Amino acid sequence: MWNITDPQGWDYDGDLYFTGMPPIDEDFSPCKLETETLNKYVVIITYALVFLLSLLGNSLVMLVILYSRVGRSVTDIYLLNLALADLLFALTLPIWAASKVNGWIFGTFLCKVVSLLKEVNFYSGILLLACISVDRYLAIVHATRTLTQKRHLVKFVCVGCWGLSMILSLPFFLFRQAYHPNNSSPVCYEVLGNDTAKWRMVLRILPHTFGFIVPLLVMLFCYGFTLHTLFKAHMGQKHRAMRVVFAVVLIFLLCWLPYNLVLFTDTLMRTQLIKESCERRKDISKALEATEILGFFHSCLNPIIYAFIGQNFRHGFLKILAMHGLVSKEFLARHHVTSYTSSSVNVSSNL
């Protein structure tokens, strides 16, 4: 019979998603989850690519926004915080990559810190995007500018988003530690004693309810009414000005929604609402790893969106280059005229 009170009896095999939930069948034996060496190195190369792109891209985004003090909008302040969250997370990717090869060799402190940064990145991202959706909803649907133009209030909202993200992520910092199971590589894992399985389910369900589902519903509500208002009023220029915001939200959902859906399925399986088998466990573990990598990719995609869609971002970047003599002022002036004529009305002033 599976003994959940003795962690030494578990066979993790490096599976970071294992919850220790015992199966109902007493004759059931733990599944052996295998990881191919090729897959490990593909993951490492992917992490390295995301790290480099995120480090360069988000640093440029922060530089451009911080340089543009005069034309900085409320949305820009939110996107600045979004870039900071992605940058902090990117700094942990080399550690995650190394753990794919040798297991978790970095000790309990780094286990807590990098797990905290990963969760804070996710929660702050969706909370900030929810705040942007509310800001755009007030500005377009209700034509409210008093709240959206007070930047000092926006700073307090951002601080609140970071604080709530820290609270939602705090259990990972408190309970995760470096653990060395028998006959397996060390892992960074939540350890809560005999009730690890039960509490891990609680720690999984509550944060994702308040840190993902609720903000997602807020975004769907706000952007639904915002789009309805834009199309109803035939506000074509304002709609074009919202392209960056919509693209950022869409990319976030495409990157993180699959992981959360697989995680929800895994939760149903762990709580025996879906029958668990070795084959399903292997499929879920592979899906979790693949969709988590997709989520990691999100940290480097926003700067690419700004570069291709955000005219203000391109102009701000060229302005910095011109200040340092890397491009001519004539070229900057021509680019500014082109940008102005192609989008003469800028409702959100976002990047």
UniProtKB/Swiss-Prot annotation:
Which CDD domains does this entry report, sorted A to Z? 7tmA_CXCR1_2
Q: Which GO terms describe its molecular function?
A: C-C chemokine binding; C-C chemokine receptor activity; C-X-C chemokine receptor activity; interleukin-8 binding
**Which residues get glycosylated?**
3, 182, 194
| Cysteine pairs bridged by disulfides in the record | 111-188
Q: Does the keyword Transmembrane apply?
A: yes
Which residues point to the Extracellular side?
1-41, 98-112, 176-204, 265-289
Q: Which residues lie on this side of the membrane: Cytoplasmic?
A: 63-76, 134-154, 226-243, 311-351
Q: Which InterPro entries match?
A: CCR1-9-like (IPR050119), Chemokine_CXCR1 (IPR001355), Chemokine_CXCR_1/2 (IPR000174), GPCR_Rhodpsn (IPR000276), GPCR_Rhodpsn_7TM (IPR017452)
Q: Which Pfam families match?
A: 7tm_1
Q: Supply the alphabetized keyword list.
A: Cell membrane, Chemotaxis, Disulfide bond, G-protein coupled receptor, Glycoprotein, Membrane, Receptor, Transducer, Transmembrane, Transmembrane helix
GO biological-process terms attached to the record: calcium-mediated signaling; immune response; neutrophil chemotaxis; positive regulation of cytosolic calcium ion concentration
Which SUPFAM superfamilies does its entry note? Family A G protein-coupled receptor-like
| Residue stretches spanning the membrane | 42-62, 77-97, 113-133, 155-175, 205-225, 244-264, 290-310
The Gene Ontology CC terms held by the record are: external side of plasma membrane
Give the quaternary structure: Interacts with IL8. Interacts with GNAI2.
Purpose of the protein: Receptor to interleukin-8, which is a powerful neutrophils chemotactic factor. Binding of IL-8 to the receptor causes activation of neutrophils. This response is mediated via a G-protein that activates a phosphatidylinositol-calcium second messenger system.
Please give the family membership noted in the entry.
Belongs to the G-protein coupled receptor 1 family.
Q: Please give the PANTHER family that the UniProt record associates with this protein.
A: C-X-C CHEMOKINE RECEPTOR TYPE 1, CELL ADHESION MOLECULE
The name under which this protein is listed is C-X-C chemokine receptor type 1
